């Protein structure tokens, strides 16, 4: 029978009205719309509050949480950075640019003014999307888990594009990466050679970061860079690289964890190759409401159904001094 009640009338455990996308009827209608050739009236009724500006359907809350977790599994930056949720466009974040100070006072002397200076960082909502196809035969197979397939493919494709932008994005229609010279991390050390890294330079990079940030700092570099770094020794002949003692935990350099990404720049003249700092000061702003849109006719002749998936997000380092990067010497 058609759904006649207003979406969102389901109650949670506390007796409060659930948001429309958190209801069982919305979830059922969403997956019916993804699987079926047409959207019957009951499906359209249930999804009326979840249609985005381009005709796609906003995913159910439960599935959105699955997508977010899948993205975290695919994208190292989501597990290291600070992730916030937004509901609309630009998000203004106040950041302290200059800290006030305390001074010693003679008895009876007035207090001097020493205010914090604030600046604002703006996080936008850039659109990131992917397109995938599934055969009608597979989609109509009751044993095929379309929810699991869409989640894994969405995470694999979107996660890779996200991670690349969070590391090297230029901020033009995409997030600003921590390795980007403009808007990214501060340069801590420049190497003596264009295509080499020394143990002393990593030690200098470590101490170029202020002590408060070192307490939660991690190293981030390309796998190819790891091959060079693992061979480095200190003045006592000890390797800087310390293999993980427990399975599943990261290796260490100078007592801090090491993470790798294929999107971190490789060693070459002028490149920013190693980051060291507190990645919690890199903020990822997820706009709520990832959406999927089914395309029935476009691939009808090949017996396939197309799906468009999209999300809006931004990422930016809100405090550049919290992360330092190693910059390779320029050639010449």
What are these regions (language model features)?
Residues 40, 64, 74, 90, ...:
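Alpha-helix initiation and N-capping motif
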Residues 95, 101-105, 114, 141-143, ...:
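Short helix/loop capping segments that flank catalytic or ligand/cofactor-binding pockets
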Residues 97-102, 129, 138, 160, ...:
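Short loop/turn segments at secondary-structure transitions that flank enzyme active sites
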């Amino acid at each position: 029978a058609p759904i006649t009640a207003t979406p969102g009338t389901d109650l949670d455990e506390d007796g409060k009205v659930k948001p429309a996308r958190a209801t069982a009827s919305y979830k059922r209608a969403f997956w019916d719309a993804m699987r079926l050739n047409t959207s019957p009236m009951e499906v359209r009724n249930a999804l009326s509050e979840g249609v985005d500006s381009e005709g796609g359907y906003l995913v159910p809350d439960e599935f959105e949480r699955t997508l977010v977790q899948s993205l975290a599994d695919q994208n190292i930056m989501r597990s290291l950075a600070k992730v916030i949720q937004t509901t609309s466009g630009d998000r203004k974040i106040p950041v302290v640019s200059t800290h006030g100070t305390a001074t010693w006072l003679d008895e009876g002397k007035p207090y001097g003014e020493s205010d914090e200076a604030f600046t604002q960082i703006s996080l936008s909502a850039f659109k990131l999307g992917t397109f995938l196809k599934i055969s009608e035969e597979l989609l109509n197979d009751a044993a095929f888990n379309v929810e699991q397939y869409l989640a894994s493919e969405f995470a694999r494709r979107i996660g890779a594009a996200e991670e690349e932008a969070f590391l090297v994005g230029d901020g033009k229609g995409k997030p600003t990466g921590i390795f980007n010279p403009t808007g990214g991390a501060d340069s801590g050390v420049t190497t003596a050679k264009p295509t080499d890294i020394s143990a002393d330079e990593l030690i200098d990079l470590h101490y170029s970061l202020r002590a408060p940030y070192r307490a939660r700092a991690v190293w981030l570099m390309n796998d190819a860079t790891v091959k060079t770094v693992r061979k480095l020794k200190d003045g006592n002949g000890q390797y800087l690289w310390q293999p993980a003692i427990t399975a599943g935990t990261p290796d260490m350099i100078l007592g801090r964890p090491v993470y790798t990404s294929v999107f971190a720049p490789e060693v070459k003249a002028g490149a920013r190759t190693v980051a060291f700092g507190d990645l919690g000061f890199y903020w990822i702003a997820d706009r709520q409401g990832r959406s999927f849109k089914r395309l029935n006719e476009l691939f009808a002749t090949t017996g396939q159904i197309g799906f468009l998936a999209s999300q809006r997000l931004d990422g930016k380092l809100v405090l550049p001094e919290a992360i330092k990067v190693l910059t390779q010497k320029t050639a010449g």
